[in-house]
Curated annotation (Swiss-Prot):
Cross-referenced CDD domains: CE4_NodB_like_6s_7s
Molecular-function annotations in GO: chitin deacetylase activity
Annotated organism of origin: Encephalitozoon cuniculi (strain GB-M1) (Microsporidian parasite)
InterPro entries to which the protein is assigned, alphabetical: Glyco_hydro/deAcase_b/a-brl, NODB_dom, Polysacc_deacetylase_ArnD
Protein name: Polysaccharide deacetylase domain-containing protein ECU11_0510
Domain NodB homology per the UniProt entry, residue ranges: 26-210
GO BP, sorted A to Z: carbohydrate metabolic process; fungal-type cell wall biogenesis
Length: 254
């Protein structure tokens, strides 16, 4: 229990709801976080191309000078994937020590940097998640800039048998009614067989693997929250709501 525990830091355990499923059923969106990783992220991109599926890469900007990975930011975009921002991991536990101005300046710098590296206006971010929520202060900073923090339905590293658990979840679902956002880490997928197996399981059940733009098309915010307006041109202004995963499963059981 594992890398995803990073996403359950106590200082983030109350705040604002974020989407953990897609706005429409029948989709699976994989969000690769904490890359790019030299020799791994490029292999993942090759595999996704061979499988004919799209995904999202929540890249950090502190990797840009490490291992000559700068070209991977643009490559991901050019191949039809979304590039998102993994907000500086060093702030996961120490953000409380920063002033509001310092937090905003740091986020602005990171957004400007990843925009330049990717050649696009990023619209999504990965920050620590706890019980489907992110810290309200960070949520407000990001959404005021047109960037949406994204949650997840399933993280394979939480289980001893990740592919088996994923298969059980998919087999117990219905593409006509369900969708999923999957959190994965570039650095844990050097052997792409797990990714390949998960894509096969999802496709065999009738799901499509999509980038975050398609997954969250028309998303305007959690019920009761102010309507969001995301930056860039990738999200259409269609008024659709979203139902958190646990509510979807409850409806299915009734």
């Amino acid at each position: 229990m594992l890398l995803c525990l990073l996403y359950f830091t106590s200082s983030w355990c109350s705040g604002s709801d974020v989407p953990d499923v897609c706005t429409n059923s029948g989709m699976i969106a994989i969000n690769f976080v904490d890359g790019p990783v030299r020799g791994v992220t490029d292999r993942i991109l090759n595999t996704l191309d061979e499988l004919g599926v799209k995904a999202t890469f929540s890249f950090t900007v502190n990797q840009k000078a490490v291992g000559n990975v700068g070209q991977l930011y643009r490559r991901a975009v050019e191949e039809g994937h979304n590039v998102a921002l993994r907000v500086d991991p060093s702030m996961d536990e120490g953000y409380q020590c920063l002033s509001q101005d310092a937090l905003e300046n740091n986020v602005d710098r990171e957004i400007d940097t990843i925009d330049g590296l990717s050649g696009t206006e990023i619209r999504y971010a990965a920050v620590p998640i706890c019980n489907g929520q992110v810290n309200s202060e960070m949520y407000n900073i990001l959404t005021e800039r047109g960037v949406l923090p994204v949650g997840y339905t399933f993280c394979p590293y939480d289980y001893d048998d990740p592919v088996g658990e994923f298969e059980s979840m998919i087999e117990g679902s219905d593409p006509k009614h369900h969708s999923f956002i999957i959190l994965m880490h570039d650095g844990q997928e050097a052997d792409t067989s797990r990714l390949e197996n998960m894509v096969k399981i999802g496709k065999d059940k009738g799901y499509r693997f999509v980038n975050m733009d398609e997954c969250l098309q028309g998303y305007k915010g959690a019920p009761g929250d102010p309507e969001l307006s995301l930056r860039g041109k990738g999200v259409e202004s269609i008024g659709k709501g979203f139902l958190p995963f646990f509510l979807m499963m409850l409806v299915r059981l009734l």
